[in-house]
């Protein structure tokens, strides 16, 4: 298997997960358990060198993961190979693959014999168009190879005396072989960004433009000799594994390609602030292209990438067209930067609109309302205050025409007018009360026997407080003492009257 070239993942439960680089400092010997490199002991680093500390950390991590004192060289290599195979992303179910590895007894030969292509994901294709040349490439194919093959296809379609006799072979097998030869040398250069150095055959003001369309899978449309089929989830071409796949449909001429695929003359002028904002919003999704240093200044090599969702439309002529429904992202190399390319693509004369991006001039700006003194905005508040002062008593009693500010005050007052309610009226003296509790307290006066009776003299009282005051006579208790003359009093009312009459000046 082509992808079995580096570490394996989650094979030993007690091992650390780590992926070493190609230039690992571990030296493998025939007998690793007896090799001096496996028994190397580091002295403490006193110089504070970060490189030394990093190497020591990697050494310990590798030894803890691979355990060279317990495993043979073949076991460690198998562990590394399976780890890298899982990291390539081609496997459908990593858990199932790990279970197969355990079932094979960690034997790579038996493990490879039990494998089938069902464990791999189907290849994802990307539709690429450059100057009228179209093809389907594997998502992991280097962008430099894509541009090179499209140029060869373009030169093969031109009716020149040289290529009429010797046509360029652009078959699928040749493209696969080319991608496999060059992918190993370029895999380290495409980890974070896609690099394209074009301009090998540029002449004059010729422009090499590349259109990469990301589309979803829909039923294919066939009309005439052109068949367009776009797989689901296609991503832009980049470097990766050495397995590449390319399909070339019939190459239409430049006139048959839609106008939006044609390159534009991108200039450095008339870049407004809104275009800079548009660039800042979409620069994370755009593909970066770096031009070579050997390209003359009068040659312009640009990369034009559209990220779209393809939906079928009625077919026109010999070529079916789709409607892009996503924002256009463009990046340019050589003489014009990415920001200027976006500024030209979204110019004022361009009728296309970018969803989610609104110009500052189109955004509604609400005028601030000043609430200063004597301002018109304060008129509603002033009228409200005047009305509140004028109509302070909003609740009027229908019986006596009294005014009240609050509804609860009016309802409490209206209880006095409810003569028909017997619970508020004293039956004996016909006195009206606001609350039933007040009426009940009052009715004790009319009772022949008062409920509270003194235990000493058997005198009865209507209220309990009166009984307590009476009992102080029998006990001789005088709790209230004057601080000025030391006189004692039985009731608080008598004490306060004494203070007013005799100690007012004090």
UniProtKB/Swiss-Prot annotation:
Where exactly are the zinc fingers annotated as C2H2-type?
A: 395-417, 424-446, 452-474, 480-503
Q: In which tissues is it expressed?
A: Embryonic stem (ES) cell-specific. Expressed in only 5% of ES cells at a given time, but nearly all ES cells express it at least once during 9 passages.
- Kindly summarize what the UniProt induction comment says about this protein's expression: Transcriptionally regulated by ZSCAN10.
Q: Which residues form a coiled coil?
A: none
| Protein's cellular compartments | Nucleus; Chromosome, Telomere
> Record's GO cellular component, any one?
nucleus
Any one Gene Ontology BP term? negative regulation of mitotic recombination
Against InterPro entries, the record matches this protein to: SCAN_dom (IPR003309), SCAN_sf (IPR038269), Znf_C2H2_sf (IPR036236), Znf_C2H2_type (IPR013087)
Q: Does the keyword DNA-binding apply?
A: yes
Q: Does the keyword Transcription regulation apply?
A: yes
Relate the protein's function as given in its record. Embryonic stem (ES) cell-specific transcription factor required to regulate ES cell pluripotency. Binds telomeres and plays a key role in genomic stability in ES cells by regulating telomere elongation. Acts as an activator of spontaneous telomere sister chromatid exchange (T-SCE) and telomere elongation in undifferentiated ES cells.
Please identify the protein, giving its name as recorded.
Answer: Zinc finger and SCAN domain containing protein 4C
């Amino acid at each position: 298997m082509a992808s079995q070239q580096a570490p394996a993942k989650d094979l030993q439960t007690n091992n650390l997960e780590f992926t070493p680089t190609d230039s690992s400092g571990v030296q493998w010997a025939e007998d690793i358990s007896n090799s001096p490199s496996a028994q190397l002991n580091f002295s403490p680093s006193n110089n504070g060198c970060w490189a030394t500390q990093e190497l020591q950390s990697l050494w310990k991590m590798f030894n803890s993961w691979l355990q060279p004192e317990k495993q043979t060289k073949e076991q460690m290599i198998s562990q590394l190979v399976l780890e890298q195979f899982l990291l390539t992303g081609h496997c459908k179910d990593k858990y199932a693959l790990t279970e197969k590895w355990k079932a094979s007894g960690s034997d790579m030969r038996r493990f490879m014999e039990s494998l089938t292509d069902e464990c791999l994901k189907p290849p994802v294709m990307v539709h690429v168009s450059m100057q009228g040349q179209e093809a389907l490439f594997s998502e992991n194919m280097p962008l430099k190879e894509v541009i090179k093959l499209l140029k060869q296809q373009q030169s093969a379609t031109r009716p020149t005396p040289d290529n009429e006799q010797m046509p360029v072979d652009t078959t699928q097998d040749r493209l696969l072989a080319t991608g496999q030869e060059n992918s190993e040398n370029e895999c380290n250069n495409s980890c974070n960004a896609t690099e394209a150095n074009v301009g090998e055959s540029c002449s004059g003001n010729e422009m090499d433009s590349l259109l990469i369309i990301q589309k979803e899978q829909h039923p294919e449309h066939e009309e005439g000799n052109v068949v367009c089929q776009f797989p689901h989830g296609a991503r832009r071409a980049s470097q990766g594994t050495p397995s590449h796949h390319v399909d070339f449909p019939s190459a239409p001429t430049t006139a048959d390609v839609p106008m939006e695929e044609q390159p534009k003359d991108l200039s450095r002028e008339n870049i407004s602030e809104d275009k800079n904002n548009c660039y800042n919003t979409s620069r994370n999704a755009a593909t970066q292209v770096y031009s070579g240093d050997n390209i003359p200044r009068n040659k312009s090599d640009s990369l034009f990438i559209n990220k779209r969702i393809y939906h079928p439309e009625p077919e026109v002529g010999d070529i079916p067209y789709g409607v892009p429904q996503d924002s256009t992202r463009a990046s340019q190399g050589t003489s014009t930067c990415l920001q200027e390319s976006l500024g030209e693509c979204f110019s004022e004369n361009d009728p296309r609109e970018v969803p989610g991006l609104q110009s500052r001039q189109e955004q509604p700006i609400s005028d601030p309302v000043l609430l200063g003194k004597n301002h018109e905005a304060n008129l509603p508040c002033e009228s409200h205050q005047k009305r509140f002062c004028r109509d302070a008593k909003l609740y009027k009693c229908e019986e006596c025409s009294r005014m009240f500010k609050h509804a609860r005050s009016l309802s409490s007052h209206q209880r006095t007018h409810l003569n028909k309610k017997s619970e508020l009226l004293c039956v004996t003296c016909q006195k009206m009360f606001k609350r039933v509790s007040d009426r009940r307290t009052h009715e004790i006066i009319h009772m022949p026997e008062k409920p509270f009776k003194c235990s000493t003299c058997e005198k009865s009282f209507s209220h309990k407080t009166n009984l307590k005051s009476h009992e102080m006579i029998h006990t001789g208790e005088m709790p209230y003492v004057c601080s000025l003359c030391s006189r004692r009093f039985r009731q608080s009312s008598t004490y306060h009257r004494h203070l007013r009459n005799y100690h007012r000046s004090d």
